[in-house]
From Swiss-Prot:
Part of the 50S ribosomal subunit. It comes from Opitutus terrae (strain DSM 11246 / JCM 15787 / PB90-1). Belongs to the universal ribosomal protein uL6 family. It comes from the Bacteria. The keyword RNA-binding applies. GO terms for cellular component: cytosolic large ribosomal subunit. InterPro entries: Ribosomal_uL6-like (IPR000702), Ribosomal_uL6-like_a/b-dom_sf (IPR036789), Ribosomal_uL6_a/b-dom (IPR020040), Ribosomal_uL6_bac-type (IPR019906), Ribosomal_uL6_CS (IPR002358). This is Large ribosomal subunit protein uL6. It holds the Pfam family Ribosomal_L6. The keyword Transmembrane helix does not apply. Gene3D superfamilies: Ribosomal protein L6, alpha-beta domain. This protein binds to the 23S rRNA, and is important in its secondary structure. It is located near the subunit interface in the base of the L7/L12 stalk, and near the tRNA binding site of the peptidyltransferase center. The gene is rplF. Keywords: Ribonucleoprotein, Ribosomal protein, RNA-binding, rRNA-binding. GO terms for molecular function: rRNA binding; structural constituent of ribosome.
Amino acid sequence: MSRIGKQPVSIPDKVKVSVKDGTVFVEGPKGRVQKTFAPAVKVTVADKQVTFAPTEESRFAKAMYGTARSIVAGMVKGVTEGYTKDLEIQGVGFKANLKGKQLDLALGYSHPILLDIPEGIKITVTDQTKVRVEGADKQLVGAVTAEIRGYYPPEPYKGKGVRIVGERVRRKEGKTVA
Protein backbone atom coordinates (compact mmCIF):
# COMPACT_ATOMS: atom_id res chain seq x y z
CA MET A 1 0.00 0.00 0.00
CA SER A 2 1.06 3.56 -0.64
CA ARG A 3 2.18 5.57 2.38
CA ILE A 4 1.37 8.77 0.51
CA GLY A 5 -2.14 7.59 -0.36
CA LYS A 6 -3.01 6.84 3.27
CA GLN A 7 -2.68 10.51 4.25
CA PRO A 8 -5.86 12.55 3.70
CA VAL A 9 -5.76 15.92 1.94
CA SER A 10 -7.08 18.73 4.15
CA ILE A 11 -9.37 21.27 2.49
CA PRO A 12 -8.82 24.97 3.34
CA ASP A 13 -11.82 27.19 4.20
CA LYS A 14 -12.11 28.96 0.83
CA VAL A 15 -11.90 25.75 -1.25
CA LYS A 16 -14.81 23.54 -2.35
CA VAL A 17 -14.16 19.90 -3.34
CA SER A 18 -16.78 17.60 -4.85
CA VAL A 19 -16.66 14.13 -6.40
CA LYS A 20 -19.01 12.84 -9.09
CA ASP A 21 -18.57 9.60 -11.08
CA GLY A 22 -14.82 9.38 -10.45
CA THR A 23 -14.22 13.03 -11.36
CA VAL A 24 -12.89 15.37 -8.67
CA PHE A 25 -13.85 19.06 -8.92
CA VAL A 26 -11.82 21.58 -6.90
CA GLU A 27 -12.88 25.24 -6.82
CA GLY A 28 -11.12 28.09 -5.05
CA PRO A 29 -10.10 31.74 -5.30
CA LYS A 30 -7.60 31.14 -8.14
CA GLY A 31 -9.95 29.10 -10.34
CA ARG A 32 -11.54 25.72 -10.93
CA VAL A 33 -9.76 22.43 -11.74
CA GLN A 34 -11.14 18.98 -12.48
CA LYS A 35 -9.56 15.56 -12.97
CA THR A 36 -11.03 12.14 -13.72
CA PHE A 37 -9.45 9.16 -11.96
CA ALA A 38 -9.49 5.47 -12.84
CA PRO A 39 -12.19 3.34 -11.18
CA ALA A 40 -9.38 1.57 -9.27
CA VAL A 41 -9.32 4.47 -6.77
CA LYS A 42 -12.25 5.58 -4.61
CA VAL A 43 -12.20 9.26 -3.64
CA THR A 44 -14.41 10.48 -0.78
CA VAL A 45 -14.93 13.92 0.75
CA ALA A 46 -15.90 14.16 4.43
CA ASP A 47 -15.46 16.83 7.14
CA LYS A 48 -12.92 19.08 5.39
CA GLN A 49 -10.77 16.14 4.22
CA VAL A 50 -10.39 14.15 1.01
CA THR A 51 -9.57 10.47 1.56
CA PHE A 52 -8.49 7.81 -0.92
CA ALA A 53 -8.85 4.03 -1.03
CA PRO A 54 -7.99 1.43 -3.67
CA THR A 55 -11.08 -0.47 -4.86
CA GLU A 56 -9.14 -3.62 -5.72
CA GLU A 57 -5.86 -5.29 -4.73
CA SER A 58 -4.20 -5.03 -8.15
CA ARG A 59 -0.78 -3.52 -8.75
CA PHE A 60 -2.38 -0.75 -10.84
CA ALA A 61 -4.79 0.19 -8.03
CA LYS A 62 -1.95 0.41 -5.53
CA ALA A 63 0.04 2.63 -7.90
CA MET A 64 -2.89 4.95 -8.66
CA TYR A 65 -3.81 5.23 -4.97
CA GLY A 66 -0.84 7.46 -4.07
CA THR A 67 -0.85 9.20 -7.44
CA ALA A 68 -4.48 10.28 -7.00
CA ARG A 69 -3.69 11.73 -3.57
CA SER A 70 -0.72 13.70 -4.92
CA ILE A 71 -2.74 15.05 -7.84
CA VAL A 72 -5.63 16.20 -5.61
CA ALA A 73 -3.16 17.82 -3.17
CA GLY A 74 -1.69 19.68 -6.16
CA MET A 75 -5.16 20.73 -7.30
CA VAL A 76 -5.95 22.17 -3.85
CA LYS A 77 -2.63 24.04 -3.82
CA GLY A 78 -3.31 25.31 -7.36
CA VAL A 79 -6.70 26.84 -6.56
CA THR A 80 -5.40 28.49 -3.36
CA GLU A 81 -1.87 29.66 -4.28
CA GLY A 82 -1.62 28.97 -8.02
CA TYR A 83 1.38 27.84 -10.04
CA THR A 84 3.85 30.03 -11.91
CA LYS A 85 6.70 29.35 -14.32
CA ASP A 86 9.04 32.04 -15.58
CA LEU A 87 10.67 31.96 -19.01
CA GLU A 88 13.57 34.02 -20.29
CA ILE A 89 14.20 34.81 -23.96
CA GLN A 90 17.82 35.35 -25.03
CA GLY A 91 19.02 36.30 -28.49
CA VAL A 92 19.36 39.33 -30.73
CA GLY A 93 15.92 40.43 -31.92
CA PHE A 94 14.13 37.74 -29.90
CA LYS A 95 11.08 39.13 -28.10
CA ALA A 96 7.57 38.38 -26.89
CA ASN A 97 4.40 40.51 -26.89
CA LEU A 98 0.80 39.97 -25.87
CA LYS A 99 -1.83 40.58 -28.55
CA GLY A 100 -5.23 40.06 -26.97
CA LYS A 101 -5.62 36.33 -26.21
CA GLN A 102 -2.44 35.42 -28.12
CA LEU A 103 1.26 35.45 -27.31
CA ASP A 104 3.33 36.81 -30.22
CA LEU A 105 6.88 35.42 -30.29
CA ALA A 106 9.63 36.74 -32.58
CA LEU A 107 12.34 34.07 -32.39
CA GLY A 108 14.43 34.65 -35.50
CA TYR A 109 12.15 32.81 -37.90
CA SER A 110 10.79 34.38 -41.10
CA HIS A 111 7.34 34.53 -39.49
CA PRO A 112 6.04 35.47 -36.04
CA ILE A 113 4.80 32.62 -33.83
CA LEU A 114 1.29 33.18 -32.46
CA LEU A 115 0.30 31.03 -29.49
CA ASP A 116 -3.34 30.95 -28.39
CA ILE A 117 -3.51 31.27 -24.60
CA PRO A 118 -5.69 28.45 -23.20
CA GLU A 119 -8.55 29.03 -20.76
CA GLY A 120 -7.32 29.17 -17.15
CA ILE A 121 -3.83 30.43 -18.04
CA LYS A 122 -2.60 33.99 -17.51
CA ILE A 123 0.55 35.12 -19.32
CA THR A 124 2.38 38.34 -18.50
CA VAL A 125 5.32 39.76 -20.46
CA THR A 126 7.82 42.17 -18.91
CA ASP A 127 10.44 44.04 -20.97
CA GLN A 128 9.82 41.71 -23.99
CA THR A 129 12.28 39.06 -22.78
CA LYS A 130 10.62 37.75 -19.61
CA VAL A 131 7.42 35.70 -19.83
CA ARG A 132 5.47 34.49 -16.78
CA VAL A 133 2.90 31.69 -17.12
CA GLU A 134 0.37 31.48 -14.25
CA GLY A 135 -2.61 29.23 -13.57
CA ALA A 136 -4.40 26.92 -11.14
CA ASP A 137 -3.75 23.70 -13.12
CA LYS A 138 -0.16 22.53 -12.59
CA GLN A 139 -0.20 20.25 -15.64
CA LEU A 140 -1.55 22.97 -17.95
CA VAL A 141 0.98 25.56 -16.72
CA GLY A 142 3.80 23.09 -17.40
CA ALA A 143 2.41 22.15 -20.82
CA VAL A 144 2.10 25.78 -21.97
CA THR A 145 5.60 26.54 -20.66
CA ALA A 146 7.02 23.52 -22.51
CA GLU A 147 5.21 24.54 -25.70
CA ILE A 148 6.68 28.07 -25.57
CA ARG A 149 10.16 26.68 -24.83
CA GLY A 150 9.78 24.12 -27.63
CA TYR A 151 9.60 26.80 -30.33
CA TYR A 152 13.30 27.62 -29.82
CA PRO A 153 15.03 25.61 -27.05
CA PRO A 154 18.33 27.06 -25.80
CA GLU A 155 21.15 26.01 -28.08
CA PRO A 156 24.53 24.97 -26.64
CA TYR A 157 26.88 27.15 -28.73
CA LYS A 158 25.63 30.71 -28.24
CA GLY A 159 23.01 30.01 -25.56
CA LYS A 160 20.24 31.83 -27.39
CA GLY A 161 16.67 30.61 -27.23
CA VAL A 162 13.80 30.32 -24.76
CA ARG A 163 14.74 28.91 -21.37
CA ILE A 164 13.05 28.37 -18.04
CA VAL A 165 14.50 30.68 -15.38
CA GLY A 166 17.09 28.73 -13.42
CA GLU A 167 17.62 26.18 -16.20
CA ARG A 168 21.27 25.38 -16.73
CA VAL A 169 22.26 25.15 -20.40
CA ARG A 170 25.33 23.04 -21.10
CA ARG A 171 27.61 25.09 -23.31
CA LYS A 172 29.88 23.62 -26.00
CA GLU A 173 33.02 24.96 -27.56
CA GLY A 174 32.82 25.92 -31.22
CA LYS A 175 35.07 24.63 -33.99
CA THR A 176 38.71 25.52 -33.63
CA VAL A 177 40.52 26.95 -36.61
CA ALA A 178 43.95 25.41 -37.17
